[in-house]
């Protein structure tokens, strides 16, 4: 689904998504990534929701967001509180939702000027 007809270069905007991945400023990504409004997307070494660990969230914490939108794949899944304890201790909100909802929510919060991180899990097929 295309979200925006044109991309913005000032901020990292989700411009589309489908089953094969996500577009950030019209660039297609097919691997898990972290997106913040003012910095280019970075790889996030998460192959599946079940593979998440506390170290994966340390990478997000280093970006110093106010809120984290976690895209859990094709369906919404809930994260164990111990995995996000460091973020919670810093009063960083973490919301888990399916990838499509996560992309839309990120764009809304980004447009509001919030310091939001999109942590998107794009599952890697088993080899």
Where are these regions (language model features)?
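Non-catalytic interface/targeting segments
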Residues: 1-52, 63, 111-127
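Short glycine-/small-residue-rich flexible loop motifs, especially phosphate/cofactor-binding loops
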Residues: 19, 84, 106
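Short active-site-adjacent helix-start/loop capping segments
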Residues: 43-44, 76-79, 105
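Short, charged beta->alpha transition segments
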Residues: 53-59, 105-106
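Mid-chain, well-packed structural core segment of small domains
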Residues: 61-97
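C-terminal structural segments of small proteins and small subunits
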Residues: 93-122
């Amino acid at each position: 689904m295309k979200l925006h007809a044109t991309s913005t270069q000032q901020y990292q905007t989700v411009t589309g998504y489908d089953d094969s991945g996500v577009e950030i400023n019209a660039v297609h990504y097919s691997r898990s990534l972290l997106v913040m409004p003012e910095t280019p997307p970075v790889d996030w070494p998460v192959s599946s929701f079940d593979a998440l660990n506390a170290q994966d969230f340390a990478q997000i914490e280093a970006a110093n967001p106010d809120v984290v939108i976690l895209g859990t794949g094709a369906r919404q899944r809930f994260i164990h509180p111990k995995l996000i304890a460091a973020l919670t201790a810093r009063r960083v909100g973490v919301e888990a939702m399916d990838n499509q909802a996560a992309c839309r929510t990120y764009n809304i919060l980004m447009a509001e000027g919030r310091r939001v991180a999109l942590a998107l899990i794009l599952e890697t097929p088993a080899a």
